[in-house]
């Protein structure tokens, strides 16, 4: 198992869903694909440097987790289907 960090940017435009609910939904989806989440950090709402897909801001959340390298692709694909996720980046931690 390797340690990873995932930065997820949520699209909060036009949604009534609380941020905490979105955070737990994504965590549950990651766990179903074999990730063991060790930490979650809500960095808050931040403005983008430029507009992206008609959005000027997003809710930034960082997940620290451990998983097998083969689990990253299914996690990424599953979260890609969620319309409330604007961007997602993954980094391998040392």
UniProtKB/Swiss-Prot annotation:
Organism of origin is Akkermansia muciniphila (strain ATCC BAA-835 / DSM 22959 / JCM 33894 / BCRC 81048 / CCUG 64013 / CIP 107961 / Muc)
Instruction: Please cite one Gene Ontology biological process associated with this protein.
Output: translation
Q: State the GO CC annotations.
A: ribonucleoprotein complex; ribosome
Briefly state the protein's biological role. Answer: Binds together with bS18 to 16S ribosomal RNA.
Alphabetical keyword list? Ribonucleoprotein, Ribosomal protein, RNA-binding, rRNA-binding
The superkingdom listed in its UniProt entry is: Bacteria
Q: What is this protein called?
A: Small ribosomal subunit protein bS6
Q: Which gene encodes it?
A: rpsF
GO MF, one term, reads: structural constituent of ribosome
Task: Tell me which family the UniProt entry assigns to this protein.
Answer: Belongs to the bacterial ribosomal protein bS6 family.
Identify the InterPro entries for this entry.
Ribosomal_bS6, Ribosomal_bS6_sf, Ribosomal_S6_plastid/chlpt, Transl_elong_EF1B/ribsomal_bS6
Pfam families given for it?
Answer: Ribosomal_S6
């Amino acid at each position: 198992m390797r340690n990873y960090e995932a930065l997820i940017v949520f699209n909060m435009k036009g949604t009534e869903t609380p941020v905490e609910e979105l955070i737990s939904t994504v965590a549950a989806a990651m766990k179903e694909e074999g990730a063991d989440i060790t930490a979650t950090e809500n960095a808050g709402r931040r403005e983008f440097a430029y507009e992206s897909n008609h959005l000027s801001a997003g809710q930034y959340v960082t997940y620290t987790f451990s998983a097998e390298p083969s689990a990253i692709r299914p996690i990424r694909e599953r979260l890609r289907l969620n319309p409330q996720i604007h961007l997602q980046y993954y980094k391998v931690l040392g």
